[in-house]
């Protein structure tokens, strides 16, 4: 079954979805296909996760992916790697201060193509 993205106008997001689908196919990793399908849905269905929630449920060294935005409410004390579509300005500043790594979803998928030990937060 192919995933076609016809309703998205944001070229960067379309490329992100296509990249996730390609990585999923090459490595038989269902997690990246799931992320692509979530992003292909309407924007109203995207997740918006605050830093305090990531800090509450993550452990040091975890890889967290968010099919949506990471917002800057709360603080983060754990050293985690976060992949998301968008990071708010406040979240970016707090992540830099705390020493966390943050990147796009396709970069996380390229770094971990099998998707092992990756947690999805919604």
Swiss-Prot record:
This entry's Gene Ontology molecular function terms read: structural constituent of ribosome
GO BP annotation list: translation
Superkingdom assignment: Archaea
Keyword Ribonucleoprotein carried by entry: yes
Q: Which Pfam families match?
A: Ribosomal_L18
Q: Which UniProt keywords apply?
A: Ribonucleoprotein, Ribosomal protein
What does the entry list under GO cellular component?
A: ribonucleoprotein complex; ribosome
Which family does the UniProt entry place this protein in? Belongs to the eukaryotic ribosomal protein eL18 family.
Q: Which NCBIfam families match?
A: PRK04005.1
This chain's protein is named Large ribosomal subunit protein eL18
- This protein's gene is called rpl18e
